[in-house]
Amino acid sequence: MTAVGAREVYQLFRDVALQQKTLRPDVGPHWRDVDTGSVWVRIDQHRIALFKDAGRLHHCLRCELDDGRVAEQQAWDSPGTDPLELLSVWERTQLLRALAG
């Protein structure tokens, strides 16, 4: 099974920004209820854990794709390789709106 690349996860976030896919809360606390900690979301059947630090979207902790592939934060440990870092300012703003919604 091939690894989950940062670009593959970025594309999910981008599709949410472009309103081509829907982001919804998964198990656990909702985005608005967490100041610092992890929040699970779903994009289609993919599960993604995001880390929020002092109220701000910080990094991607884990991604579980619907085909069974999984990537942990360590997969994107090098600078500039976290899927969230690949988002443009506009895409990130749209993602944050979807998280808050």
Language model feature labels by segment:
Residues 1-44, 70-89:
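Negatively charged, low-complexity tracts enriched in Asp/Glu with abundant Ser/Thr
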Residues 18, 55, 97-101:
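Short, intrinsically disordered, mixed-charge
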Residues 48-82:
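Intrinsically disordered, low-complexity regulatory segments enriched in Ser/Thr/Pro
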Residues 85-100:
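Helix-rich interaction surfaces within compact, conserved domain-sized segments
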